[in-house]
């Protein structure tokens, strides 16, 4: 599985993606690709990324469907109840941003995003987190920065994920990360497709399946049935 920005398919008039796909196919992979949005998989972040999946076996694979809106986490769900004052911006910054806010009556909570032109737009979700882009300066309610835990939650990390580095590194790590629920959903469909392929006798020549090869190379335990339900 590979992940990249959604514009990969348009880069160099589509030639970059074409070369990647053709190279994977020459290596023997059956390739599937689709742009998925993290918003559709349960996190309050508009993060559109192309996911490229390859199989050495000719399996019948489909990308996962978006989850129901009722099951998606909202911004309210991921915000911490108590936040240290160090995350709050100076009054001058807050007042300046509110003055430039396009919709001054936008309901809270919201995340505002300052683009390259200095325009500030509120949304009920985060834009795609970035590793170090000052042009994507996000604030919650134009009052404070997201905490480390909130940044991780925006990417779908569980709360038992330990924070052992300072804020700047968490910001960089979450900006470089994939959205966990998206990758989990795709991986679940990959496992289901491979399982179905082999249950229907797709591997009749006696060779090891991709699942078996993965488990052997990683010394992994057999994949439990609940992973493909």
Where are the language model's segments positioned?
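Conserved Class I SAM-dependent methyltransferase catalytic core
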Residues: 1-46, 50-55
């Amino acid at each position: 599985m590979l992940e990249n920005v959604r514009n990969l398919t348009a880069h160099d008039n589509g030639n970059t993606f074409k070369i990647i796909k053709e190279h994977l196919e020459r290596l023997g992979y059956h390739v599937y690709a689709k742009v998925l949005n993290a918003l559709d998989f349960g996190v309050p972040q508009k993060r559109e990324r192309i996911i490229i999946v390859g199989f050495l076996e000719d399996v019948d694979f489909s990308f996962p469907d978006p989850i129901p809106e009722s099951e998606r986490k909202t911004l309210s769900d991921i915000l911490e109840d108590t936040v240290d004052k160090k995350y709050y911006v100076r009054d001058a910054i807050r007042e300046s941003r509110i003055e430039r806010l396009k919709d001054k009556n936008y309901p809270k909570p919201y995340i505002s995003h300052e683009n390259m032109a200095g325009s500030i737009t509120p949304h009920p979700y985060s834009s795609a987190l970035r590793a170090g882009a000052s042009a994507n300066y996000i604030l919650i309610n134009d009052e404070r920065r997201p905490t480390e835990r909130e940044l991780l939650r925006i990417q779908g990390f569980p709360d038992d994920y330990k924070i052992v580095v300072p804020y700047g590194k968490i910001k960089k790590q979450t900006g470089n990360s994939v959205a966990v629920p998206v990758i989990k959903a795709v991986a679940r469909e990959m496992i289901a497709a491979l399982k179905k392929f082999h249950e229907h006798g797709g591997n009749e020549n006696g060779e090891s399946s991709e699942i078996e090869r993965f488990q052997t190379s990683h010394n992994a335990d057999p994949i439990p049935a609940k992973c493909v339900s």
